[in-house]
Design a protein with these regions (language model features):
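Domain-edge interaction signal
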Residues: 1-201
Length: 201
């Protein structure tokens, strides 16, 4: 078995999700993409106890940010796509003017091919499509406001720690109504982590 099989599967799902969202959403900015990925992961986790991409999110000012991905694609004020993504995704610079007259530089993802949805389970495909439909015409600002709604992962984390910048704990997103208990989800995540660690040795 390939030592990196677990990471490769997560990486492939991340790429295909980004290709899909950039195709289906009108404003696939960097911050919007972060929001969409977070929605995909947290919604799937709430139903199954496992995220789709296995990204770790932190609670930043404007919403949840996948820290590892952000650090990988951000170089100063530029957005640089990794080699394994650049054949499938492009990125265009755009500039918008706010109501106050402030000019803001944005990056818009652009798909170069059709997404391969075969890497996702039927449940993952359903959630992927639901998230894209919800935010199809939303702006990054509207998506950011949605992140701040009561009960959302970002809001729970800020309330828990009283500050921005902390890691959003997937387990904290589960409620009594969730199909999976916190204990079950914790055990599944620990098993998945142990599996990856064993094959990385």
């Amino acid at each position: 078995m390939n030592p990196k099989i677990g990471k490769n599967v997560n990486r492939q799902k991340l790429l295909e999700a980004m290709v899909y969202f950039s195709k289906k959403v009108k404003n696939p900015t960097k911050m919007m993409m972060y929001k969409l990925l977070a929605e995909l992961d947290f919604r799937h986790f709430e139903e199954t106890g496992m995220p789709v991409t296995n990204l770790e999110y932190v609670a930043w000012k404007r919403g949840p940010v996948p820290k590892g991905l952000h650090e990988e694609i951000t170089e100063g004020e530029e957005l640089i796509l990794p080699k394994d993504f650049s054949d499938s995704l492009g990125c265009d610079k755009s500039e918008i003017e706010t109501e106050s007259g402030e000019k803001i530089r944005m990056f818009l993802f652009r798909h170069k091919r059709k997404p391969n949805l075969k890497v996702f389970s039927p449940r993952q495909q359903r959630i992927l499509k639901e998230v894209a439909e919800i935010y199809k015409y939303a702006t990054a600002t509207e998506a950011s406001k949605a992140s701040h709604e009561p009960g959302k992962p970002w809001t729970k984390t800020i309330k828990k720690y009283g500050r921005e910048g902390d890691v959003i704990d997937y387990i904290d997103q589960l409620t009594e109504k969730s199909p999976v208990s916190k204990q079950e989800a914790t055990e599944m995540m620990e098993e998945a982590k142990a599996f990856l660690n064993n094959y990385q040795q």
